[in-house]
Each structure stands twice: as C-alpha cells, then as structure tokens.
Amino acid sequence: MTATLERRESASIWGRFCNWVTSTENRLYIGWFGVLMIPTLLTATSVFIIAFIAAPPVDIDGIREPVSGSLLYGNNIISGAIIPTSAAIGLHFYPIWEAASVDEWLYNGGPYEIIVLHFLLGVACYMGREWELSYRLGMRPWIAVAYSAPVAAATAVFLIYPIGQGSFSDGMPLGISGTFNFMIVFQAEHNILMHPFHMLGVAGVFGGSLFSAMHGSLVTSSLIRETTENESANAGYKFGQEEETYNIVAAHGYFGRLIFQYASFNNSRSLHFFLAAWPVVGIWFTALGISTMAFNLNGFNFNQSVVDSQGRVINTWADIINRANLGMEVMHERNAHNFPLDLAAVEAPAVNG
C-alpha cells in the first residue's frame, strides 16, 4: 500500500512538472525546449563573462605564441575577446577533462569551444521554444522560421566555417575587434565581397532596415484619430482592440503618390509577409554563402580579366581588391607562415600584369 501511494505521489509530481513546463499561463513560457535552453545559455553566458574578464592568453595559432584576450591581461572592452581554440586542437572535442590540467585547457583556448557549442545549442532551443509556444497558443509557426535566419548565420560562422577550414582556431573571436578581424581575414581569404550570396545578405539587411523605417513612419503618420485635438492620439486606443488603429488605404495612397502606384501594398498581410521575408531570405543566403566559402568555394575572381589588344592588363576594381586582399592576408597570422598561400604557390599570380 505504501509503495502504491509513493508511486502515485511521484507520478503527480512529474505530472505537475509537465503541466508547469508546458503552461502558457506562466509569466515566461518554459517549454520542453526551454528545459535545455536555460542551462546551455546560462553556461555559455557564465563562461563568457568569466573568460572575458580573466582568461589567460591562448596559443591560437599553435606556434607557442599566445594571444591575450581578457580584461585582466591588458585589454579593454573594444580590444577584448574570447580567443578561439588553438590550431593544435583543430576540430577535436576539447572539454576540461581532455586536458592534462586546467592551465593547459585555458592555454589551448578551451573556453571558446564550451561557449560556442553551448551557445549554438541554446539559440537552437530558443528557436524551438518559439515554435512550441506558437503551437500551444494555436498560432502559425512563422516567428520561429524568421528566427532561423540569425541561428543559421551564427551556426555558419561558429561551426560550419571552422569545420570547413579544419580548426576551431578559424572561428570568429567573441569580441568587438575580434569580429572585425574575422571579417577582414575572411575577405582576404575568400573574397566575400564578390560573392553573390553576400550581396543578397547586404540587400536583405539594409533593405529590411529601410522597409521597417518606411512602414513604421507610414503607420504612425496615418493613425485614425479617436480623440480631440486637445488629447493625445494614443489615448484613443487600447491594447488588443479589434478595430484598426491606422488607415492602410491612406498610407497606401500616400506612398503610391510619392513613388508610383504599384510600389505600395494595399493588403496588410502581403505587406507584413514582405517585411518579414526580405531580411530573412537575405540572411539565409549569407549563411549559405559562409557555409560554401567554408569549403573554399569563394567569391568571384575577375583579376586581370581585362586586357588590351596587345595582351597588356588594364587594371579594374577587381585588381584593386585583389591587391588589398593580398595585403590583408600577409598581415594575418604573420608569424605562423612567411607568405600567404597564394604567394607561396609555385607560380605567384602577377599583380601588375
């Protein structure tokens, strides 16, 4: 009898836990994805803060020349970063127990792996949690689909690119200047500015910003006034009301006269789908571009493609970019190798023709 009661009590505790996790009445929805998201993001955040403040220098290139990234070792907020795991580790899974000591683990950049892997798992669970909450509330799943764009971008930069290049040391450092360094080196090695998928991503981000600003300004400029001139227009509305708060016909008419008739939307659902899809698709393409360049399928190369009737090279903007890329590549990992890979080839490419 006692055993039966204990089993029932145990089952009820588990049942209460399940109900609490999946309840949409909580101030913050937990969800089953949240059960995994919370510890992974807390781990990533905690290790990041501690390492950013106090981590010792890391031998990023695997040549016994450690690079300092933390505040206590001479950096500031701008120059500080979590230095990627050493090239000596490569793509090996490198938890603390794989190192001979904590000092060795820190020297080889172990914190970078633990942060990145927990972070990627955490943001993927956050995306799943968005879908889960939408499902519980009877909503459509497009919020999670939109969030998949930054998740794909982060996965491309922190996981796919290191896999393609053969080492976590090629991942993006976790800091402000480290991010810019990653961008410069990426341009030098992969000519990303000449990759069409990156161009689509730029159009998506800047276009999305423009369209959001246009939409917000049009809506706030065409509110339906429910109050007198002596009261704020905001006082005429309440959260969740069924009536329209702005006049889309007026906004459509204004914008149609400002540009031309078919440049504006007269359907609210089409408009908001466009506002969501434009930047999301652009960032998807950028993530796909990073993932292809990870395996050295690089941007277009038009170097020395224009010649005169006598075969002499007429320099174009592509040749200027090529020269800049070589300069950036020479500066990168200057002690790890004497020449960038394309200069160290059997036949170096001519720059001046």
Curated annotation (Swiss-Prot):
Broad EC category: oxidoreductase
Origin species: Conocephalum conicum
Subcellular location: Plastid, Chloroplast thylakoid membrane
Chain residues in the propeptide: 345-353
Residues that hold chlorophyll a PD1 according to the record: 198
UniProt membrane topology term: Multi-pass membrane protein
Site (Cleavage): 344-345
The name this protein goes by in its record: Photosystem II protein D1
Effect of residue 276 to T: In strain: YFS
Main subcellular location: plastid
UniProt cross-references to CDD domains, sorted A to Z: Photosystem-II_D1 (cd09289)
Binding site for a quinone: 215, 264-265
